[in-house]
Amino acid sequence: MSTGFFGDIAKIKYEGPESTNPLAFRHYNPDDVVLGKRMEDHLRFAVAYWHTFVWPGGDPFGGQTFERPWFKDSMEAAKLKADVAFEFFQLLGVPYYCFHDADVRPEGRNFAENTSNLNAIVDYFAGKQGETGVKLLWGTANLFSNRRFMAGAATNPDPDVFAFAAATVKTCIDATQRLDGENYVLWGGREGYETLLNTDLKRELDQLGRFLNLVVEYKHRIGFKGTILIEPKPQEPTKHQYDYDVATVYGFLKRYGLENEVKVNIEQGHAILAGHSFEHELALANALGIFGSIDMNRNDYQSGWDTDQFPNNVPEMALAYYHVLAGGGFKTGGTNFDAKLRRQSIDPEDLLIGHIGGMDCCARGLKAAAKMIEDKALSAPLEARYAGWNVPEAKKMLDGGFSLEEIEAWVLKSDVNPQPKSGRQELLENVVNRYV
């Protein structure tokens, strides 16, 4: 039954590249087969509950611009928001959604009320999932918005806050399992510091390590089959966050014995804030064996903060999905649109148009990436670039067959005198441009 929020808009359909209908897909056809798999199954699109249905359209210089009938802190409003959300998922035809606990339930007076409210809305969500077939990609806890978390959650100097946060995560994992969620995400929005003058770095890192171990231990104790994910971000809201980027997260996981238990959820905008490209973070996660999922969006390259816009750069998406596919594709992860409307985009249909454009952009990127893989457009030159490592002496240097002295003897005996070879960067850039 329609809520009426989206008026008479019908389910969004694929109309092909020639269509000029803003409420139609031009490139995303869920049933298109790409590399032997349906496009929908490759991309595994999800809608972010927080930006789509919770964000009021404010900025540091002005307040709410969006008028939504569910912008009230009550269970009745939470259920209306859920009705609109699941109607939206069906209009778009997305298979998944994601949420924080605070996105979906009214705020209670204490932990017990928060838990009761969350359980009530989870029951409601379970019914909506059964009616629509839409599934939960991942759940998470908001451990950054409430003032109790102003000095962090797991890294807070107050053990009561640590306990409150741990208990909250426990209830959110329970909710995720109840809804058959395929992952559980931890984003340390305030797990960092504003100044070192009042920060004990070692203590806070040890607290964070113990917190994450508690999560993993609980996952195994209750038999949760999903993947635990950390979402890296370098700063904002804190000056310096402990989950700065993929490399930092991997070092943290190794230190606390969690590198085989936890993977990463990589956001495009966070990669840019960290001074990296999106594809760098994806390629590194693959190389380290911790790639899990992505939050898809776009940052304004001039602003210097997290703008969370919808993706519209096809060449960038092509390289991103190239690395997703090269790593074997998503297992339990997917493409979550962690993107929000601009504050002047106040019409209900703007929510659909933003997601349609993002989904089309990702579809174009996926198809270009798949074609590059089929043609070995990048893998063949890469293999040729490193071909020298296939000779016996080169293999011995890496597998322990040569000591440093033996390498020296080989260099002298064979008169090894390496000559530079072109990296052919311009050629490879031109190759990529042929596909996008």
UniProtKB/Swiss-Prot annotation:
UniProt cross-references to SUPFAM superfamilies, sorted A to Z: Xylose isomerase-like (SSF51658)
Binding site for Mg(2+) 2: E267, H270, D306, D308
EC numbers: 5.3.1.5
Gene encoding the protein: xylA
Organism of derivation: Rhizobium meliloti (strain 1021) (Ensifer meliloti)
Name of this protein: Xylose isomerase
Family annotation (InterPro entries): Xyl_isomerase-like_sf, Xylose_isom_bac, Xylose_isomerase
Catalysed reaction, written as an equation: alpha-D-xylose = alpha-D-xylulofuranose
Textual note on the cofactor: Binds 2 magnesium ions per subunit.
Enzymatic class: isomerase
Subcellular compartments: Cytoplasm
Active site: H100, D103
GO MF annotations in UniProt: magnesium ion binding; xylose isomerase activity
